[in-house]
Amino acid sequence: SRRQRQMCIRDSSTAATLTSLKLDNGEQLPTLEQYLKAAKKTKTQLILELKAHSRPERETLAVEKIVNMVKKLGLEKRMEYITFSLHATKEFIRLAPAGTPVFYLDGKLTPKELKEMGCAGPDYHLSVFQRHPEWIKECHDLGLKVNAWTVNKPKDMKWLIEKNIDFITTNEPILLQEKVSD
Protein backbone atom coordinates (compact mmCIF):
# COMPACT_ATOMS: atom_id res chain seq x y z
CA SER A 1 0.00 0.00 0.00
CA ARG A 2 1.18 3.50 -0.81
CA ARG A 3 2.00 5.80 2.00
CA GLN A 4 -0.50 8.65 1.94
CA ARG A 5 0.38 12.14 3.12
CA GLN A 6 -1.01 15.58 2.68
CA MET A 7 0.84 18.78 2.01
CA CYS A 8 -0.61 22.15 2.86
CA ILE A 9 0.74 24.70 0.43
CA ARG A 10 -0.25 28.33 0.83
CA ASP A 11 0.70 31.51 -0.97
CA SER A 12 2.80 32.33 2.09
CA SER A 13 4.88 29.12 1.77
CA THR A 14 8.51 29.90 0.99
CA ALA A 15 10.39 28.54 -2.02
CA ALA A 16 12.91 26.93 0.35
CA THR A 17 10.13 25.09 2.19
CA LEU A 18 8.45 23.93 -1.00
CA THR A 19 11.60 22.76 -2.78
CA SER A 20 12.62 20.75 0.30
CA LEU A 21 9.48 18.61 -0.01
CA LYS A 22 9.87 15.10 -1.35
CA LEU A 23 7.14 13.66 -3.55
CA ASP A 24 5.87 10.11 -3.07
CA ASN A 25 8.19 8.93 -5.86
CA GLY A 26 11.21 10.30 -3.97
CA GLU A 27 11.79 13.30 -6.25
CA GLN A 28 11.99 16.87 -4.97
CA LEU A 29 9.01 19.11 -5.65
CA PRO A 30 10.21 21.09 -8.70
CA THR A 31 10.02 24.84 -8.98
CA LEU A 32 7.84 26.25 -11.74
CA GLU A 33 10.98 27.18 -13.66
CA GLN A 34 12.33 23.61 -13.43
CA TYR A 35 8.97 22.23 -14.53
CA LEU A 36 8.72 24.61 -17.49
CA LYS A 37 12.30 23.87 -18.57
CA ALA A 38 11.46 20.16 -18.61
CA ALA A 39 8.23 20.86 -20.53
CA LYS A 40 10.18 22.92 -23.07
CA LYS A 41 11.83 19.70 -24.27
CA THR A 42 8.40 18.35 -25.30
CA LYS A 43 5.77 19.46 -27.81
CA THR A 44 2.96 19.29 -25.25
CA GLN A 45 0.45 22.14 -25.02
CA LEU A 46 0.83 23.59 -21.52
CA ILE A 47 -1.98 24.56 -19.19
CA LEU A 48 -0.97 26.40 -16.04
CA GLU A 49 -3.45 26.75 -13.18
CA LEU A 50 -2.87 29.55 -10.72
CA LYS A 51 -4.53 28.87 -7.38
CA ALA A 52 -6.35 31.74 -5.71
CA HIS A 53 -4.16 33.75 -3.33
CA SER A 54 -5.02 35.45 -0.05
CA ARG A 55 -4.89 38.96 -1.54
CA PRO A 56 -5.30 40.42 -5.04
CA GLU A 57 -1.84 42.06 -4.90
CA ARG A 58 -0.26 38.64 -4.38
CA GLU A 59 -2.15 37.30 -7.40
CA THR A 60 -0.99 40.21 -9.56
CA LEU A 61 2.62 39.61 -8.50
CA ALA A 62 2.28 35.87 -9.20
CA VAL A 63 0.78 36.51 -12.65
CA GLU A 64 3.56 38.99 -13.49
CA LYS A 65 6.26 36.50 -12.48
CA ILE A 66 4.60 33.62 -14.33
CA VAL A 67 4.07 35.57 -17.56
CA ASN A 68 7.67 36.85 -17.47
CA MET A 69 9.07 33.36 -16.84
CA VAL A 70 6.99 31.85 -19.65
CA LYS A 71 8.25 34.60 -21.98
CA LYS A 72 11.88 34.15 -20.86
CA LEU A 73 11.64 30.43 -21.67
CA GLY A 74 9.96 31.06 -25.04
CA LEU A 75 6.82 29.10 -24.18
CA GLU A 76 4.18 31.79 -24.83
CA LYS A 77 2.70 30.08 -27.90
CA ARG A 78 2.25 26.78 -26.02
CA MET A 79 0.80 28.20 -22.80
CA GLU A 80 -2.78 28.52 -21.61
CA TYR A 81 -3.84 29.79 -18.20
CA ILE A 82 -6.70 28.69 -15.95
CA THR A 83 -7.76 29.95 -12.54
CA PHE A 84 -10.72 30.11 -10.16
CA SER A 85 -9.81 33.69 -9.25
CA LEU A 86 -11.63 36.37 -11.21
CA HIS A 87 -8.87 38.86 -10.36
CA ALA A 88 -6.12 36.52 -11.59
CA THR A 89 -8.14 35.80 -14.75
CA LYS A 90 -8.29 39.52 -15.52
CA GLU A 91 -4.57 39.89 -14.75
CA PHE A 92 -3.59 37.04 -17.10
CA ILE A 93 -5.70 38.64 -19.84
CA ARG A 94 -4.03 42.01 -19.17
CA LEU A 95 -0.43 40.78 -18.88
CA ALA A 96 -0.06 37.73 -21.15
CA PRO A 97 0.58 38.28 -24.86
CA ALA A 98 -2.57 39.12 -26.84
CA GLY A 99 -4.35 35.97 -27.93
CA THR A 100 -3.06 33.82 -25.06
CA PRO A 101 -5.94 31.55 -24.00
CA VAL A 102 -7.15 32.34 -20.48
CA PHE A 103 -10.02 30.28 -19.08
CA TYR A 104 -12.09 31.01 -15.97
CA LEU A 105 -12.87 28.02 -13.73
CA ASP A 106 -15.39 29.25 -11.17
CA GLY A 107 -18.63 28.73 -13.11
CA LYS A 108 -20.19 32.04 -12.09
CA LEU A 109 -19.97 34.02 -15.33
CA THR A 110 -22.15 33.76 -18.42
CA PRO A 111 -20.65 33.31 -21.88
CA LYS A 112 -21.36 36.98 -22.64
CA GLU A 113 -19.54 38.13 -19.48
CA LEU A 114 -16.54 35.92 -20.33
CA LYS A 115 -16.39 37.30 -23.88
CA GLU A 116 -16.59 40.91 -22.64
CA MET A 117 -13.70 40.20 -20.24
CA GLY A 118 -11.51 38.80 -22.99
CA CYS A 119 -11.56 35.19 -21.78
CA ALA A 120 -10.96 32.35 -24.23
CA GLY A 121 -13.99 30.68 -22.64
CA PRO A 122 -15.28 28.80 -19.64
CA ASP A 123 -13.50 25.86 -18.05
CA TYR A 124 -16.34 24.85 -15.75
CA HIS A 125 -17.31 21.79 -13.75
CA LEU A 126 -19.63 19.46 -15.62
CA SER A 127 -22.51 20.34 -13.26
CA VAL A 128 -22.47 23.97 -14.47
CA PHE A 129 -23.13 22.85 -18.05
CA GLN A 130 -25.78 20.40 -16.85
CA ARG A 131 -27.59 23.39 -15.26
CA HIS A 132 -26.92 25.62 -18.29
CA PRO A 133 -26.58 23.37 -21.37
CA GLU A 134 -27.35 26.36 -23.61
CA TRP A 135 -24.06 27.95 -22.55
CA ILE A 136 -22.06 25.57 -24.76
CA LYS A 137 -23.78 26.81 -27.94
CA GLU A 138 -23.77 30.42 -26.68
CA CYS A 139 -20.00 30.18 -26.19
CA HIS A 140 -19.48 28.78 -29.67
CA ASP A 141 -21.70 31.51 -31.16
CA LEU A 142 -19.45 34.07 -29.40
CA GLY A 143 -16.26 32.40 -30.70
CA LEU A 144 -15.30 30.97 -27.31
CA LYS A 145 -13.87 27.52 -26.55
CA VAL A 146 -15.48 25.36 -23.86
CA ASN A 147 -13.94 22.88 -21.41
CA ALA A 148 -15.71 20.75 -18.80
CA TRP A 149 -14.06 19.08 -15.80
CA THR A 150 -13.69 16.47 -14.28
CA VAL A 151 -15.72 14.10 -16.44
CA ASN A 152 -15.23 10.41 -15.69
CA LYS A 153 -18.61 8.77 -16.44
CA PRO A 154 -19.28 7.49 -19.98
CA LYS A 155 -22.81 8.97 -20.05
CA ASP A 156 -21.48 12.42 -19.15
CA MET A 157 -18.73 12.17 -21.77
CA LYS A 158 -21.30 11.17 -24.40
CA TRP A 159 -23.60 14.06 -23.44
CA LEU A 160 -20.79 16.63 -23.73
CA ILE A 161 -19.55 15.20 -27.03
CA GLU A 162 -23.10 15.42 -28.41
CA LYS A 163 -23.17 19.08 -27.28
CA ASN A 164 -19.95 19.68 -29.29
CA ILE A 165 -17.82 20.60 -26.28
CA ASP A 166 -14.27 21.53 -27.29
CA PHE A 167 -12.32 19.98 -24.41
CA ILE A 168 -12.97 17.50 -21.61
CA THR A 169 -10.79 17.11 -18.54
CA THR A 170 -10.91 13.53 -17.26
CA ASN A 171 -9.15 10.99 -15.09
CA GLU A 172 -10.23 8.35 -17.64
CA PRO A 173 -8.46 9.33 -20.90
CA ILE A 174 -8.71 5.89 -22.53
CA LEU A 175 -12.45 5.75 -21.88
CA LEU A 176 -12.82 9.27 -23.29
CA GLN A 177 -10.86 8.34 -26.43
CA GLU A 178 -13.23 5.41 -26.93
CA LYS A 179 -16.26 7.72 -26.57
CA VAL A 180 -14.80 10.24 -29.03
CA SER A 181 -14.20 7.41 -31.52
CA ASP A 182 -17.76 6.02 -31.22
Model segments located where?
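Short, small-residue-biased leader/transition segments that mark boundaries at the very start
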Residues: 2-9
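Short, basic/glycine-rich phosphate-binding loops at helix/coil junctions
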Residues: 10-19, 41-50
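Alpha-helix boundary/capping residues
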Residues: 22-25, 39, 96
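Short loop-to-alpha-helix "cap/lid" segments that border enzyme active sites
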Residues: 34, 42-182
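Short, charged beta->alpha transition segments
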Residues: 29-39
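Glycine/small-residue-rich loop that forms an oxyanion/phosphate-binding "nest" at active or ligand-binding sites
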Residues: 16-30
